[in-house]
Amino acid sequence: MSFTLAIVGRPNVGKSTLFNRLVGKRLALVDDQPGVTRDLREGAGRLGDLRFIVVDSAGLEIAEDDSLQGRMRRLTERAVDEADVCLFVIDARVGVTAADEYFADILRRRARHVILAANKAEGRAGEAGAMEAYALGLGEPLRISAEHGEGMDDLYRALVPLAEAFEAQNVQQAPETDVAVEDGDDETEDWRPSESKPLQIAVIGRPNAGKSTLINKILGEDRLLTGPEAGITRDSISVSTNFMGTPVRIFDTAGMRKKARVTDKVEKLSVADGLRAVRFAEVVVVLLDVGIPFEQQDLRIADFAETEGRAVVVAANKWDLEEDKPEKLKELREAFERLLPQLKGAPLVTVSARTGKGLDRLHNAILKAHEVWNRRIPTARLNQWLSTMTEAHPPPAPGGRRIRLRYITQVKTRPPAFVVMATHTDKLPDSYQRYLVNGLRQDFDMPGTPIRLTFRDQGTKNPYKDKASKINQSGALSKHKHRQKPKGS
């Protein structure tokens, strides 16, 4: 059974705590400051045997339309329009407020189904507020405690008949799925994005670089808050969509400021949330403001993504505002190669999140980075390459002891990782390791993706020695048996 449940209500009534309880993870920021959730965020909800999409919304506030709170209210109203069920949460300890009455009227007019929940109703402190909730005209309120899990069985019973009705409706509208795969399909292609396994992308950057605007342009709707206020995205929001034919799940992260400037408690939580989003991503898009590119924080963000082993694409936003584009592009490429040598060759694309120009370039760069991140190179080709590299530039011989690179193999993908069997690995200089990594990038067309290269000291061992010895012994024994004459002949 699948349906969408939107949690709505005033700020600080416990919506995000309830969201976290329903998804079974700490996905939404929770704090006692009002207005911590500023965007819509989705999660996979679970209650008993019910499975559904749960949406955590910004707090409903009466505000002017052009204010930040006004834009938050419009986003929440959109969630109400799109949801199958709205769970309207009030604070039982505070009681029914004028804002509750105002938004209850909106829900009566706009929502398909409304369930009223009086949160924080545990103990006597919430009794009066729970009784007041009857006056909202939305039916009997459920008395719950999102923090302690009380009342979840009542919520389950309220959802079951609705879920069954949605299930009957979905059966009629469901597309064909679980199509059998024919024999002979290439199993090595299973990493390619699909509806069941969308490509996961994190968009990171400094505050107000245009991350939410870019994602809204990809989505074709104002799903995420945008505006002139730096840092209006606080949570790491993930949304699923089809980006030019590619199924993707995109994380819009909170803007990452320098640590010295991160003083607000909630903003510290948001930055940590953004860093977690990088770990969930396959490709990380580092979004720069072309007017002030490659500031110290941009470099730290890109370096963090590389350290985490993610494929990286650098996108310079607000390109529509740049007058001398050829000269600016030349400057960007030079600065990129000089300041981020660890991401040598990573795609650098220019975009305008406002107009949508350059989205095709960004899409192609993301797909290329993802393909390289999943690259698998045959061992035979690697060893031919290693032989060529060592002949062209032999390893040094510190103290007259020659370093021998005997064998290389790929041990991992996502990102590509290689192991070289060698002698005296402790004497191999970093410069020679960089020579090999750069060679792998260039010769196997792996720009930008992190490459992990480790060296395993074999001493004087030859990886083929034991195998060759066994083969020779087996051959000699076989010949000996054939030469033996039967006794008594």
Swiss-Prot record:
InterPro entries listed in its UniProt record: G_ENGA, GTP-bd, GTPase_Der, KH_dom-like, KH_dom-like_a/b, P-loop_NTPase, Small_GTP-bd
Residue ranges, compositional bias (Basic residues): 478-489
SUPFAM superfamilies: P-loop containing nucleoside triphosphate hydrolases
Region (Disordered) residue spans: 454-489
Gene Ontology MF: a single term: GTP binding
Residues of the EngA-type G domain: 3-167, 199-374
GO biological process, alphabetically ordered: ribosome biogenesis
Binding site for GTP 2: 205-212, 252-256, 317-320
Binding positions (GTP 1): 9-16, 56-60, 119-122
Domain KH-like: from-to ranges: 375-461
Key words, A-Z: GTP-binding, Nucleotide-binding, Repeat, Ribosome biogenesis
Known role: GTPase that plays an essential role in the late steps of ribosome biogenesis.
SUBUNIT field: Associates with the 50S ribosomal subunit.
Protein name, per record: GTPase Der
The organism's taxonomic lineage, starting at the top: Bacteria, Pseudomonadati, Pseudomonadota, Alphaproteobacteria, Rhodobacterales
